[in-house]
């Protein structure tokens, strides 16, 4: 598989993309980032009536299940990844994580919520910011 920067450069110009397509690209890049850290993705886009979890991964080094919120931006007009994680968002993620865990038999030593910000701009390489353990 080509590097992330080569892969992104081979895509159509960003001006023709929908918000959903940009979000999906951000999630794909976040998953590649998690893979590079040795994490194993358990599920993507898990939904229930209360909302959606973008990525659920396992961190074998920490024996933890990690719920990852992915925020993709093409500009800085709406703030960075830190501004995107409001107390309400954290409460929602905790609730959704609890619901996902309730439906599983497997147990982990730790549960963590991470946020990955993906900034896709004119640069050849997307900027990835990974905030670990926000809740």
UniProtKB/Swiss-Prot annotation:
Pfam families: UPF0102
SUPFAM superfamilies: Restriction endonuclease-like
InterPro entries associated with the record: Restrct_endonuc-II-like, tRNA_endonuc-like_dom_sf, UPF0102_YraN-like
GO terms for MF: nucleic acid binding
Cysteines paired by S-S bonds: none
NCBIfam families associated with the record: PRK12497.1-3 (NF009150), PRK12497.3-1 (NF009153), PRK12497.3-3 (NF009154)
Family indicated by similarity: Belongs to the UPF0102 family.
Entry protein name: UPF0102 protein Mjls_1965
Organism annotation: Mycobacterium sp. (strain JLS)
